[in-house]
Amino acid sequence: MSEAELTLRPMTRAEFDEWLPRQVAGYAALIAASGAMPAQAAREKAERDTARYFGSGAATPGQLVFRIMDGEVSVGWLWLGVPGPDPDPLMAWVFEIEAAFRGRGYGRAAMRLAEEEARARGMTSLGLNVHGQNMVARSLYDSLGYEVTAMQMKKTL
């Protein structure tokens, strides 16, 4: 992979329609795996949260969904969005490199592209959420200079 060849391409409507159910299922699985709530409640939360951000489908204002492309090959996807009335920071809500392409520098290069996208839109920062059990992602974000701004913890009794 050459960083020069890596690009963000807006998803087509068909790609979005295929991606969205996978996104909901993946988000629900992360919530349930964290122990925050049972699987069914996690699924319902994932559906509500996703519907809130994509009320108008792929063309919802403030939400940007990209394929991460290495030349003509899709290696992952990225969802950037405005979380509320204050547009800054832009949030990297979902960022995933396909399993077959992990460990080859795509994640680092894609995050740099996300930062460029935020700058191009006049943002002064790019935020993200990382689940506590995702040590690979946490290590990547630390190495790129991201700082912890909030943390949730729990103890099962």
Model-identified regions with their sequence ranges:
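Actinobacteria-biased recognition of intrinsically disordered, low-complexity terminal regions
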Residues: 1-5
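Acetyl-CoA-dependent GNAT
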Residues: 6, 10-99, 117, 148-157
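Residues that form or flank phosphate/diphosphate-binding pockets in enzymes
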Residues: 87, 105, 136
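Conserved GNAT acetyl-CoA-binding A-motif
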Residues: 89, 111, 119-129, 152
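Active-site acidic-Proline motif in GNAT/NAT acetyltransferases
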Residues: 98-100, 104, 132-133
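Conserved amphipathic alpha-helical interaction elements at protein-protein interfaces in regulatory
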Residues: 103, 116-120
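Short glycine-rich hinge loops at helix-strand junctions in the catalytic core
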Residues: 105, 122, 145
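Conserved active-site alpha-helix within GNAT-family acetyltransferase domains
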Residues: 108, 112, 132-150, 155
